[in-house]
């Protein structure tokens, strides 16, 4: 792309020497200007196509990441449910109020431990 800046043209800046002397020169200059504009439009078109491709790839990536985040959210909810269940069971075990319940639990667990050791040794 060219770095042309457009500014207001003062009448004093125009001289007869700057102006083409024949219609053929005017036509040639106009064709050159049109060709330059076509070349610049082609560059702009290429840039637009590149940006379109990039935006399409970004959209695809966002769709994939959205799906992955949804899956992660579902797995987190499942894990949270399982953790809540385990915490409730632990709370129930640790809140045995009376000593007789605690003693019964200790005896049952001890008997289970001895049974497992006996089975492993035999």
Curated annotation (Swiss-Prot):
It is found in: Membrane. It is a single-pass type IV membrane protein. This is Putative syntaxin 6. Residues 122 are extracellular. Residues 31-93 form the t-SNARE coiled-coil homology domain. The keyword Transmembrane helix applies. The chain crosses the membrane at residues 101-121. Keywords: Coiled coil, Membrane, Neurotransmitter transport, Transmembrane, Transmembrane helix, Transport. InterPro entries: Syntaxin/epimorphin_CS, T_SNARE_dom. One of its GO terms (cellular component) is Golgi trans cisterna. Residues 1-100 are cytoplasmic. Its main location: membrane. Belongs to the syntaxin family. SNARE promoting movement of transport vesicles to target membranes. Potentially functions in retrograde trafficking and in the endocytic recycling pathway. SMART domains: t_SNARE. The keyword Flavoprotein does not apply. One of its GO terms (molecular function) is SNAP receptor activity. CDD domains: SNARE_Syntaxin6 (cd15851). One of its GO terms (biological process) is intracellular protein transport. Pfam families: SNARE.
């Amino acid at each position: 792309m060219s770095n042309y800046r457009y500014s207001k043209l003062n009448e004093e800046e125009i001289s007869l020497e700057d102006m083409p002397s024949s219609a053929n020169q005017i036509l040639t200059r106009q064709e050159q200007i049109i060709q330059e504009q076509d070349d610049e439009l082609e560059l702009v078109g290429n840039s637009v196509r590149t940006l379109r491709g990039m935006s399409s790839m970004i959209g695809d990536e966002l769709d994939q990441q959205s799906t992955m985040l949804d899956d992660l959210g579902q797995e987190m909810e499942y894990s949270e449910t399982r953790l809540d269940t385990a915490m409730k069971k632990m709370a129930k075990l640790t809140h045995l109020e009376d000593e007789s319940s605690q003693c019964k639990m200790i005896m049952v667990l001890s008997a289970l431990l001895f049974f497992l050791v006996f089975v492993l040794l035999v």
